[in-house]
């Protein structure tokens, strides 16, 4: 993969800036039906991937020439801004909370990212249709439960999506997530898996004998 470009990295880091960090948003958590009041600045700190990881995804997409990207879990659209800045021609990102999705849409409009589309609705309701994008890379960062991860993988298989790369964020989020990752690594269907700690990377049906790598990242 191309080397780390400090100038390019710093240019992309600007996406982490929240324009109105004290803006308060209110929404209902769709899973737990809990009313949430939080500032956009705090929400960004709570859910956003590290700059290092987002830049890694950007480089991965460019290096492997991926053109269609599907992200599960938009939040404020910070990570998707990195994806939208890559050479990918189409980026679809799914967000289940309408109030948050609207903020992401506003961000992409200001960036003039016409090739980035926010898919509103719970991911379990929108994932199947979104696979119609025929993504080269799928980034999963919406639901940190093993049952959700295996549901994503099952739907991908059922719909015979020829995705080249699946990235699962936060594989060390919990014992449950790590157990799921270990099960994926042991699955013969996934011939190439890579653990970079912040995420697990799967290359389904890669034409090699089964291999797994752990990379300090």
Question: Where is each model-derived feature located?
Answer:
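A short alpha-helical cap/connector motif
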Residues: 1-139, 143-165, 171-217
């Amino acid at each position: 993969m191309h080397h780390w470009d400090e100038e390019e990295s710093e240019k992309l880091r600007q996406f982490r800036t929240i324009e109105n960090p004290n803006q308060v948003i209110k929404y209902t958590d769709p899973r737990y039906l809990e009313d949430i009041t939080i500032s956009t600045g705090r929400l960004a700190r709570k859910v956003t991937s590290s700059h290092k990881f987002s830049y890694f995804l950007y480089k991965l997409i460019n290096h492997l020439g991926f053109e269609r990207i599907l992200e599960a879990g938009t939040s404020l659209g910070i990570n998707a801004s990195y994806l939208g800045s890559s050479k990918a021609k189409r980026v679809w990102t799914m967000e289940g909370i309408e109030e948050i999705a609207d903020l992401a849409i506003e961000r992409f409009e200001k960036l003039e990212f016409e090739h980035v589309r926010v898919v509103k609705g719970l991911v379990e309701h929108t994932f199947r249709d979104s696979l119609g994008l025929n993504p080269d890379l799928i980034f999963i960062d919406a639901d940190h439960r093993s049952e959700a991860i295996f549901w994503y993988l099952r739907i991908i298989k059922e719909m015979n999506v020829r995705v080249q790369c699946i990235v699962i964020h936060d594989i060390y989020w919990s014992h449950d997530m790590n157990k799921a990752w270990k099960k994926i690594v042991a699955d013969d269907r996934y011939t190439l898996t890579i653990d970079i700690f912040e995420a697990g990377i799967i290359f389904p049906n890669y034409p090699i004998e089964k291999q797994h790598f752990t990379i300090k990242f």
